[in-house]
Design a protein with these regions (language model features):
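Short linear capping/connector segments at secondary-structure termini
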Residues: 28-32, 91-94, 160-167
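Short helix/strand-bridging catalytic loops that position acidic/His residues to coordinate divalent metals
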Residues: 164-171, 202, 232-239
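Short, well-structured active-site flanking segments
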Residues: 25, 150-161
Length: 365
């Protein structure tokens, strides 16, 4: 019995030492508590806030749903009949994936921005100017995501703190007027307190600049002056006039910051296909950037051109067809409406017509 007791004690002691060793491991998962130590980590997290822009549910693929309210294009093409249901036809349901996925993406971006702003002060060795720039970019992106929410849904849940648990997630909606005030305040303040000028960024529009904030502010004021904002209330003529004047004010700031239209309508398209910025006119103020080719861990390549671009065959098995391996292919799912077609034709604008509406498709010889 004594030997048995000694053995049990020895085993317990052994398990105790093993348990202590096991529990003393360094954390292997990233959390706000063990992250935000260096400027590099802060930059990486900020990139994650930007990354929402390139998701397939946003500019990476479904952006055409955001312009579905106009009458310039319709879904069809490549052997498909015109669409008759869904958001693109203005008869979506609450279960439409294009609706729910966009909603989730926007709130994911907002939550990331909230986490970033709550933890940025933990970073050591930060250059003060860089820190201000990062904070301004995060604030702008959060406001931009809220702008997309009120554009699409009006009154929406509103929060400026990150989600810490799975409880208390049913937040009541906030009046869109209050959210508009927040959007404008955040964007204007970001432009003045941290964002770099477009010239300081060498007019590379992948990064948010003062011009970005001013340009989007002009859009916000124009949208706020419309029926969507005034729904449910009577705006005075003075209010509407002020919104349009503010839109003009910010648009003028962009125009005097070194931006102008390219000499040729097609220049930005050629530059984009050449994977370079248009620096001859700095026409592009802000771009959602993409990377990767869908074959690696970096899969943020986007497919807008693949969906709305020139119809062509799958050349993925070909090499050097256009000077490079796998030049890709296009579905041409989005077709021009007769209205847009006639706008070009009736104005005799054949050059822009041929670059905007392809009256042909590419077939492999």
């Amino acid at each position: 019995m004594k030997a048995l007791k000694i053995t049990i004690i020895a085993l317990l002691a052994g398990f105790s030492m093993v348990s202590c060793d096991f529990l003393d491991k360094e954390p292997t998962k990233l959390t706000p508590e063990n992250y935000f130590n260096t400027p590099a980590e802060a930059n990486s997290f900020l990139t994650g806030i930007y990354a929402i822009l390139s998701q397939p549910t946003f500019y990476g693929g479904d952006y055409m749903y955001l312009v579905a309210g106009d009458d310039l294009s319709h879904y069809g093409g490549s052997g498909r009949g015109p669409a008759s249901t869904g958001l693109i036809c203005n008869n979506a349901t609450t279960s439409d994936n294009a609706v729910t996925a966009f909603w989730y993406a926007l709130y994911s971006g907002i939550n990331r921005a909230n986490m970033f702003l709550e933890n940025i002060d933990k970073v050591n060795g930060f250059d003060a100017g860089v820190k201000e720039q990062y904070i301004a970019e995060a604030r702008f992106l959060r406001a931009f995501y809220y702008f997309n929410l009120v554009e699409c849904w009006g009154d929406v849940p509103f929060k400026t703190v990150s989600t810490q648990s799975v409880t208390n997630l049913n937040i009541p909606r906030t009046d869109k007027q209050e959210i508009y005030d927040f959007i404008i305040s955040e964007m204007a303040d970001a432009a003045e307190t941290g964002l770099k000028s477009a010239s300081d960024l060498a007019y590379k529009p992948g990064r948010i600049s003062q011009s970005t904030a001013w340009g989007i502010l002009a859009r916000v004021y124009l949208f706020r002056a419309g029926e969507h904002y005034r729904e449910g209330r009577n705006a005075t003529q003075a209010e509407k006039k002020d919104y349009f004047e503010r839109a003009s004010f910010y648009a003028q700031k962009v125009m005097t910051a070194g931006h102008k239209l390219a000499a040729n309508y097609w220049d930005p398209f050629i530059d984009m296909c050449s994977d370079k910025y248009n620096t001859t006119a700095n026409e592009s103020i802000w771009e959602a950037e993409f990377a990767g080719n869908n074959t690696s861990d970096t899969q943020a390549e986007g497919r807008i051109g693949n969906i709305i671009g020139l119809a062509g065959p799958d050349l993925s098995s070909k090499s050097d067809v256009t000077g490079a391996k796998d030049p890709g292919y296009g579905y041409a799912f989005i077709y021009s409406t007769p209205k847009l077609y006639n706008l070009y034709v009736n104005n005799g604008d054949t050059k822009r017509f041929n670059w905007s509406i392809a009256p042909f498709e590419y077939k492999e010889a």
